[in-house]
């Protein structure tokens, strides 16, 4: 099924082990020159590419939810990603009529850090007792495409929880303390 593909995009849960398994299985099927894109919102590409047999062809391609409404796609270069892989990925993203931006390889990249703060503060305000309508109206009035609570809902709490728990594991593996926010506490209560 994948043999003739020039570029594939893996879009499984934000879980390093699952992504590593999918990478190995997919790379066994695609050509040596095919681009392997990982749709991840938080996991650094250089780390994911360690599971690739050809890290020069490995790149991050982060779509935003809801995909059909969000024009932006983050392209994330890993430490070993080639310029040719970047060029092919830019062409692909433009062909599907999305707007590509190339961002640094760091946990959360650019937009997940910005939107995480935006939605997290919306949820924190909710936890403080501010009425949801006030939070949502303020979000809309700033010119954002979606209000913070609506965006949290559109992204899906279960997905956000998976991202958060993987990020927490990564912090712990690095010997760092994970910052517990009001958003984390509320998600934990709602999802667990």
Predicted regions located by residue number:
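N-terminal glycine-rich phosphate-binding loop for ADP-containing cofactors
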Residues: 1-192
């Amino acid at each position: 099924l994948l043999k003739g593909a020039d570029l594939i995009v893996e879009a499984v849960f934000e879980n390093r082990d699952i992504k590593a398994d999918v990478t190995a299985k997919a790379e066994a099927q695609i050509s040596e020159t095919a681009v392997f894109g990982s749709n991840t919102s938080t996991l650094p590409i250089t780390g994911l590419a360690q599971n690739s047999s050809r890290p020069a062809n490995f790149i991050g391609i982060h779509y935003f939810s809801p995909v059909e409404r969000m024009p932006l796609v983050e392209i994330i270069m890993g430490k070993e990603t080639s310029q040719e892989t970047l060029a092919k990925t830019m062409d692909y993203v433009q062909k599907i009529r999305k707007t590509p931006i190339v961002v640094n390889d760091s946990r959360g990249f650019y937009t997940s850090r910005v939107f995480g703060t935006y939605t997290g503060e919306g949820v924190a305000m909710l936890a403080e007792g501010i009425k949801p309508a006030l939070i949502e109206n303020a979000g809309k009035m700033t010119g954002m495409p979606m209000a913070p609570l609506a965006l949290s809902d559109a992204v899906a709490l279960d997905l956000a929880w998976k991202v958060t728990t993987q990020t927490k594991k990564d912090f712990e593996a690095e010997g760092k303390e994970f910052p517990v926010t009001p958003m984390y506490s509320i998600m934990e209560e709602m999802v667990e």
